[in-house]
Amino acid sequence: MALLWAAQGLSYIGDQIFDTTLVVWIASVLAKDQTWAPLAVSGVLIAVAIPTLVIGPLAGVFVDRADKRRMMIATDGVRAALIAFLLVSTGVVGGFRPSIEVQLASIYVVVFLTAAATQFFGPARISLVRDVVPEDARARAQSLSQVNASVSTIIGPPLAVPTLFVLGIQWALVANALSFVISLGLVVLVRPPAQPAHAPPGAAPSFMRELREGFQFAGRNVVVRTLLVSLFIVMLGGGALNALDVFFVINNLGTSANLYGFVGAAMGVGVLVGALLAGGLAGRIGLNRMYWMSLLSFGIFLLIYARLTSFIAALVLLFVVGFPQAAVNVAAAPILMGATPRELLGRVFSLVQPISATASILSTAGAGFLATSVLANLHAQVGPVRIGTYDTIFTVAGLLILAGGVYAWNNLNSAYGK
C-alpha cells in the first residue's frame, strides 16, 4: 500500500503543478494582454471536462477486463510521453517556436489526452487497492489518499508559479513528466495477489453488454445507488460554493479579493486535518454512519456560512468545513469497494467522476445564472436577517447538501438494517 500511496502522491502533486502552470502560462505569456485570454484559459477546463464526462463511464469496462497494475503503468507512461510531446510541440525545447495558435492547440490536445488517460488510472488504482488492502484497513488507506490530495492542493499551486517564472515553463513540464515516471516505477514494484480472470460464462466479451452490466448494477444495488445519487445532490450544492464564493467574500464578508486565497487555504488545511482523523473515526462509528453524518454536517455548516459577515469567522468555519468534506471522501471509496463485486468495480467507480462533474457543471451554471439575473439585485430584510444574492444561493446550496445527507441516512440505514 505504501508504494501505491507514494505513487498517487507524486501524481497528484505533478497534476497540481501542471494544471496551475498551464493556466498561468496561457494567461500571462501566450495570451498576455489579449481580449480572448479568458476564453483560452477556459479551453483548458473544457479539455479536461469532456473526457471526464464522455470517456469516464466507458473506461471502467476496459479497467475491469485488464490487469489493474499494468493499466496504471500504461497510463502513467502515456501521460509522461504526452507531457514530453508538449515540450516539443509548443517549441519550449528544440529551438523551433510555432505560432500561438499551434501552441494552444497542442496544449488542448495534450490536456484532453492526459485527462482521458486519467479516467483509466483512477478506477484501476481503486481496484488495485481493493486487491492489496484488507477490508478493515481500507478506511485508513483512503484517509492517506485524501491526505495526498490535500497536501498536493496546498503545495502544488504555490510551487507552480515560481517554477514557471524563475526556472521556466520547461522545468514545470519536466517536473510533471518526472512525477508520472516515478509513479510508474513505484507501481512496477507493487505485487498484488493473483486474481482469477473474469469471463462471463458462455458469452464472448461484449463492450456494450459489459457497460450495461455496470449501469444496471449501480442502479439496482441500494448502497451504490445511494452513494451516487447523494454525491450528485451534494455536488449540486457544492458547485455553487465553488463558483460564487469569491463574490460572497467581497460582498457579504466585506473583504478584498486579495485575501481570497486564504479561503482556499483554510479549507485545504481543514481537509488535511480531517483526513488524518477520519480513518480513526471510521473505526469507531463505521463508514456508513460517518458518510451520512458528514453530509449533514457539511450542509449545516454551509447554512451557517451563508449568514456570516466576518471574514475571520468565515476562515474558522471553512477550516471546520474541511473535516466533513474529508470524511465524505474517505468513506465513499471503501463503501463502494465493499458493496461492489471485484469484476464490476472499475465500471462502478468510473461513474463517480462523471456524475460529480455533471452536477458541478449544472450547479455552477445555475448559480451563475441566478446571481446575474433573477437574484441579481436581491436586497431584503426579514426581521434582523438581511437577505442578499449570494447568501440566498448558499442557503439553497446548504439545503441541497442536507437533503443529500438525509437521503443517504435513510437509505444506508435501511440497506444495513439499522
Segments from the language model and where they lie:
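Juxtamembrane intracellular "pre-TM" segments in multi-pass secondary transporters
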Residues: 1-2, 192-229, 418
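Primarily residues marking transmembrane-helix entry/exit sites
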Residues: 1-5, 38, 100-108, 210, ...
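Substrate-agnostic recognition of the 12-TM MFS/MFS-like secondary transporter fold
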Residues: 2-22, 44-83, 105-165, 175, ...
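Transmembrane alpha-helix termini and helix-breaking/packing motifs in multi-pass membrane transporters
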Residues: 21-32, 86-99, 155-175, 251-252, ...
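Extracellular/periplasmic helix-loop-helix junction of adjacent transmembrane segments
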Residues: 21-52, 258
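C-terminal transmembrane bundle of multi-pass solute transporters/carriers
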Residues: 42-47, 54, 65, 71, ...
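Helix-loop junctions at membrane interfaces in 12-TM secondary transporters
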Residues: 88-110, 304-318
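Helix-loop junctions on the cytosolic side of multi-pass membrane transporters
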Residues: 93, 125-132, 173-203, 223, ...
